[in-house]
């Protein structure tokens, strides 16, 4: 009988040890799992950051996957030229080329009959001619006065390549493509011995109520704000400046009780577009009190401080900021490497794994 108890005890001890080991493994896996929440107003570059994670950490886009973006790229291109043509009338700008009026009529006719995402050689020629009209170019220069995709010039300047027979989108074409994010999109990848779960949440106002489900157990928030949006208004409310909306949103997230212990990283994105714009449009259009030099560095630092000054718990909570260009893979790779080091330092120093 004694040996029976002994073997039962051994079995019990073995099971107990196995359970302990499993609990330890689960704890280690959980400690190595990083839940990243990407937040920010609409069109701030969140989805482009997600695409970069696929390029940098998940073997990029296959030819087949790139081909799936072709219709989106053509749709973005058509929407851009239609938006500029519409703004010509609103802003009272005339065409210079005599043929452009006829091209405009044909453009509208074809846009109404073609399937979304189609691009015929005839349509491509019409778009090319219109884009070459000095009146259209003058209207494009005033893009902040109406809603236009950031990718407009990228695609319209490269129509010959985009509409050539056998065209296969490259990664830059994919990165510049725009589809409004609705709901929550999760991307998983591994980096520096950590398992990342990145959640991209729709930025337009109507999408924000869905964020609440993502709050629990978030390791780090990356907040994207478009530097170049300082002279632009919201798609969903043309009375509201995009930069002001972004600051308002950042304020509510940065000081939210849910995120008291969450690392927050600020991506001041679209620095390339900001650099172009700041040479032409003074920052005082957004911040009337700003009287400093209208340079990339001075104006950029001023915007950065507008965000950082919203942090009400500076002594307890540091907000890390980076100027980014989400379409620049090397820039995102460098910045995300730094973000990962912050996560390791802030969140894993107490678990004894590093």
Swiss-Prot record:
One GO MF term on file is: G-protein beta/gamma-subunit complex binding
Q: How is it modified after translation?
A: Potential N-myristoylation may anchor alpha-subunit to the inner surface of plasma membrane.
Annotated region (G2 motif), positions in chain: 173-181
Locate the lipid attachment (N-myristoyl glycine): 2
Question: Which UniProt key words apply to this protein?
Answer: Cytoplasm, GTP-binding, Lipoprotein, Magnesium, Metal-binding, Myristate, Nucleotide-binding, Transducer
A single GO cellular-component term on record: heterotrimeric G-protein complex
Where's the G-alpha domain? 32-354
Give me the residues that bind GTP, please.
40-47, 175-181, 200-204, 269-272, 326
Q: Give the Basic and acidic residues compositional bias ranges.
A: 8-26
Disulfide cross-links: none
Q: Where is this region: G3 motif?
A: 196-205
Compartment list: Cytoplasm
Q: Where is this region: Disordered?
A: 1-26
Q: What is its main location?
A: cytoplasm
What is one GO biological process annotated to this record?
Answer: response to nicotine
Positions of transmembrane segments: none
Region described as G1 motif: spans on this chain? 35-48
Tissue specificity, in the record's words, reads:
Expressed in taste buds (sensory organs of clustered epithelial cells) of the circumvallate and fungiform papillae of the tongue as well as in palatal taste buds at protein level. Expressed in enteroendocrine cells of the gut, such as in subsets of enteroendocrine cells in the midjejunum and brush cells. Detected also in spermatozoa.
Can you tell me which residues bind Mg(2+)?
A: 47, 181
Knockout or disruption consequences: Mice are not affected in their tasting ability for salty (NaCl) and sour (HCl) stimuli, which are known not to be mediated by G proteins; but, they exhibit a significant reduction in the ability to taste the bitter compounds denatonium and quinine as well as the sweet compounds sucrose and SC45647, a guanidine sweetener. The incidence of cells responding to bitter stimulus is also reduced by seventy per cent. The residual behavioral response to bitter and sweet taste in these deficient mice suggests that there is alternative mechanism to compensate.
Residues of the region (G5 motif) are 324-329
Q: Where is this region: G4 motif?
A: 265-272
Regarding protein family, the annotation reads: Belongs to the G-alpha family. G(i/o/t/z) subfamily.
Output this protein's name.
Answer: Guanine nucleotide-binding protein G(t) subunit alpha-3
The uppermost taxa in this organism's lineage are: Eukaryota, Metazoa, Chordata, Craniata, Vertebrata
């Amino acid at each position: 009988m004694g040996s029976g108890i002994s073997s039962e005890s051994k079995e019990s001890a073995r099971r107990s040890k196995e359970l302990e080991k499993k609990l330890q493994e689960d704890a280690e896996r959980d400690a190595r799992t990083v839940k990243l929440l990407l937040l920010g107003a609409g069109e701030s570059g969140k989805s482009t950051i997600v695409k970069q994670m696929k390029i940098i950490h998940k073997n990029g886009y296959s030819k087949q996957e790139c081909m799936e973006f072709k219709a989106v790229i053509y749709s973005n291109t058509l929407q851009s030229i239609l938006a500029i043509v519409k703004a010509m009338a609103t802003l009272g700008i005339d065409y210079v080329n005599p043929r452009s009026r006829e091209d405009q009529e044909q453009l509208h006719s074809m846009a109404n009959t073609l399937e979304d995402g189609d691009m015929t050689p005839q349509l491509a020629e019409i778009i090319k001619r219109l884009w070459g009209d000095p009146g259209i170019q003058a209207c494009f220069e005033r893009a902040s006065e109406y809603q236009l995709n950031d990718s407009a010039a990228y695609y319209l300047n490269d129509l010959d390549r985009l509409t050539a027979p056998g065209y296969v989108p490259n990664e830059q074409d994919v990165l510049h493509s725009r589809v409004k994010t609705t709901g929550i999109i999760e991307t998983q990848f591994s980096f520096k011995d950590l398992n990342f779960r990145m959640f991209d949440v729709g930025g337009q106002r109507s999408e924000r109520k869905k964020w609440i489900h993502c709050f629990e157990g978030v390791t780090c928030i990356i907040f994207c704000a478009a530097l170049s949006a300082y002279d632009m208004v919201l798609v969903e409310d043309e009375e509201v400046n995009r930069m002001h909306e972004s600051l308002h949103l950042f304020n509510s997230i940065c000081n939210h009780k849910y995120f008291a212990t969450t690392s927050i990283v600020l991506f001041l994105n679209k620095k390339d577009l900001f650099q172009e714009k700041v040479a032409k449009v003074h920052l005082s259009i957004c911040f009337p009190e700003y009287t400093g030099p209208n340079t990339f560095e001075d104006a950029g630092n001023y915007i950065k401080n507008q965000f950082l000054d919203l942090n009400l718990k500076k002594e307890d909570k540091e907000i890390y900021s980076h100027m980014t260009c989400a379409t620049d893979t090397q820039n995102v790779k460098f910045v995300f490497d730094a973000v990962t080091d912050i996560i390791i330092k802030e969140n894993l120093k107490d678990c004894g794994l590093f």
